[in-house]
């Protein structure tokens, strides 16, 4: 089994790359907003109930997938590398898969802010992430998260791990998925 964690800044293309990777592998996509959009109509994103439900739902999903006969899972996440709670969450989910003897692959995407602002309003993104339909709020959130957090690693930070960092500013999602598939033999 393979567990592919695709991470990077807001609107870098994680879900779209995950969709393309799902098409060319036997892996299933579980993108970040699959849980967010289900719970958001009931609880504000900043509320303790929202955070608890999203986290618990994801953990249960990962536990079930890890003990299943699925080939693996692709998970997308805006990992705030300077956030201890985000790092703890990633460690928790990675441990679930490592205990199941899965191969964990880290795929880090980076792209220019200008390109990400364009992607932030792409039809594919808006189709699967209705909470992003308020363009002004979504753009403000993108820029604010960029300002407040570290969203891409420094060179060498992921030594000793299956890690691939791709600048996809000028690469389409299909090509990025091919690179990932080749690099990790998926």
Language model features: what each stretch is:
Residues 6:
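Hydrophobic anchor at the beta1->P-loop junction of P-loop NTPases
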Residues 9:
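P-loop (Walker A) phosphate-binding loop of NTP-binding proteins
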Residues 14:
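Conserved lysine of the Walker
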Residues 19-63:
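Conserved substrate/cofactor phosphate-moiety recognition/catalytic segment
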Residues 53-106:
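Glycine-rich phosphate-binding loop used to anchor ATP phosphates in small-molecule kinases
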Residues 58, 62, 173-181:
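Short, amphipathic alpha-helical "lid/cap" segments that border enzyme active or binding sites
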Residues 98-120, 166:
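Conserved phosphate-donor/acceptor-positioning beta-strand/loop module used by diverse small-molecule
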Residues 122-175:
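Small-molecule kinase domains that catalyze NTP-dependent phosphoryl transfer to phosphate-bearing small molecules
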């Amino acid at each position: 089994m393979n567990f592919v964690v695709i991470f990077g800044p807001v609107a870098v293309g994680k879900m779209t790359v995950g969709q393309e990777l799902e098409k060319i592998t036997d892996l299933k996509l579980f993108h970040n907003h699959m849980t967010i959009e289900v719970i958001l109509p009931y609880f504000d994103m900043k509320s303790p109930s929202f955070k608890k439900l999203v986290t618990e739902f994801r953990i249960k999903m990962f536990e079930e997938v890890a003990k299943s006969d699925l080939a693996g899972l692709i998970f997308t996440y805006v990992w705030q590398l300077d956030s201890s709670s985000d790092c703890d969450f990633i460690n928790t989910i990675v441990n679930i898969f490592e205990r199941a003897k899965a191969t964990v692959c880290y795929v880090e995407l980076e792209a220019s802010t200008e390109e990400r602002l364009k992607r932030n309003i792409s039809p594919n993104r808006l189709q699967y992430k209705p909470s992003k339909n308020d363009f002004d709020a979504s753009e403000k959130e993108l820029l604010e998260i960029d300002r407040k957090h570290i969203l891409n690693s420094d060179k060498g930070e992921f030594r000793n791990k299956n890690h691939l960092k791709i600048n996809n500013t000028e690469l389409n999602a299909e090509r990025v998925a091919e690179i990932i598939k080749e690099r990790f033999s998926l």
